[in-house]
């Protein structure tokens, strides 16, 4: 084959690679953004939405270690909501985008798990039912998983690359801009006041100034060893954001460190002899991870002044970002202290198994809905350790197994924690397919291709079923105390009667049920929506929402004179809500309150 033919073949391979990457990214994007509001917000999403609403409207958020997790979710979502509005689609989009970027980031591992391996891993991540489901949730998990992959890719590139690439420069610039964005918005709002045009004008001006400063910082970094330290600084930034996102960061980081040590030990103990190693090195292989060793990492750190500077810079980046977010951009000093206290609180929380599924919960859930990934990742781990050749594949396998074991041992279990180990499992599964397809054995090649196709088909169906059909079905593995789809019908009815009253969003709504999340989010624009969590005397409210069964007797006693019963709606498993409206607003189908426990007639409603 002459040089022209070689060049043509390379171009063809490059074209196939680019088209494949674009197609997989398109699938990931479609699955994460299509019908994003089809399922109502979960209880936790509603609480996160409440924190974000306060930050959006009042510019105030104070980190409290007793309230959910870290502050990053709210500040990242703030940028989205300022541009696209405080809407359900917007807040979920601010999470979904990181689900897509996880898939994109996987393409950069092609040197370490093979081209076919990285494409397959990315496809599995794009199609994983759990990855898609949690990407469509306004919670911390997906950004957390993205950061964990960001740490790995950054460190690998720091060891293996000599010069910073364009995308790493772009990511560094983005991190710097994000760090300053809330301050920009705050200053713009303060100077612009109630004038929207002025707010946008000041915001644009501040943004331009910050962009110039960021460009100067990037230029300075590029003059330092061709920008190679950028990768380590990115790893430090991702690590800091990881801890500022969720307390489980120490489990992820600890598992990664243990995995690195175990890979080194395994290769030392079970190192193949020189003849077999030479044969393995000469076999067809597009994986080039030979540089991923400690001496090369130590060399990349440099010595003398360079070593001191890169160490100090990494520590400063880590501390600055952590303090920045936990202190609510230097406005809440107690938040930094709370970041440390959070681990004592999390230790108590982690000692309870709310799902009552025992230590095998994740294996059970995984085999129910992520079986292709679980099985192929096990095969990939086996291949990696039998070969003892591909360091990154061994690391990914141990990373996956370590997290799986850690979360299985810890009593506290929720389905969304599983995606932390589904990520490295997809990498190991992709590696398994790569090794089979790259084999000289035609039967093994065919088997690898068939397994990839079967896995893709199974995952595609399960993803569709979970995310677009049975998204609130408690029999599904990832559905955990989720809000029932009937809840959206309740919100529609509240809006209908509020409009019918002529008062619209000024209508008075009394929520006396002790269970009401995520209703706070959906009624955020109703100025007189009150959440009492207990029965109160009401005389002038247009609408009342009460808890069925538990409050029925007292509801009938207190509200029968002025209110009628409309319908009962499921909030979540075991919790139903009754909708009452003032008699002058009620339709002909409304009932007296003493009749609200009568059986539903066929065709009468939900």
List the model feature ranges, each with a label.
Residues 130-131, 240, 403-404, 515-516, ...:
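Solvent-exposed loop/turn segments at secondary-structure junctions
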Residues 312-316, 498-505, 535-540:
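Flexible, charged surface loops at secondary-structure boundaries
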